[in-house]
Amino acid sequence: MPTYNQLVRFGRKSKIRKTKSPALESNPFKSGVCLVVKTVTPKKPNSALRKIATVRLSNKRTVNAYIPGEKHSVKEHDRVLVRGGQVPDLPGVKYHIVLGAYDIAGVKGRKQGRSRYGATRKQVAATKK
């Protein structure tokens, strides 16, 4: 416990919190250009081929970003929008690519959780009585 005089002289130091997505620089999203699209295997005990892309952001930083959903249209040199969000079983992947933004199409045939995958609502035909 500090003395009153110590508080007057030095004050209280607030804890510095470390950000989980430093490359975004406190922005919700950053745009970038896709450099490489590849598949990686997750940590134990999971098994899959997860799709990731190496992206050069508009602030000149290079990050690995996860491509969510089934099937994707991400190619080299595509413009992408990147948001924060880690992938639990992929070490070093701290970002997600936003589907349905810029050059990236949304997941086709998606009925639930559409907003996360950039899928549009299927129009139901009006029936006559």
Swiss-Prot record:
It comes from the Bacteria. Keywords: Ribonucleoprotein, Ribosomal protein, RNA-binding, rRNA-binding, tRNA-binding. The keyword Repressor does not apply. One of its GO terms (cellular component) is small ribosomal subunit. The keyword rRNA-binding applies. The lineage of its organism: Bacteria, Pseudomonadati, Pseudomonadota, Alphaproteobacteria, Rickettsiales. GO terms for biological process: translation. PROSITE patterns: RIBOSOMAL_S12. With S4 and S5 plays an important role in translational accuracy. Interacts with and stabilizes bases of the 16S rRNA that are involved in tRNA selection in the A site and with the mRNA backbone. Located at the interface of the 30S and 50S subunits, it traverses the body of the 30S subunit contacting proteins on the other side and probably holding the rRNA structure together. The combined cluster of proteins S8, S12 and S17 appears to hold together the shoulder and platform of the 30S subunit. Belongs to the universal ribosomal protein uS12 family. GO terms for molecular function: rRNA binding; structural constituent of ribosome; tRNA binding. HAMAP family: Ribosomal_uS12_B (MF_00403_B). This is Small ribosomal subunit protein uS12. Part of the 30S ribosomal subunit. Contacts proteins S8 and S17. May interact with IF1 in the 30S initiation complex.
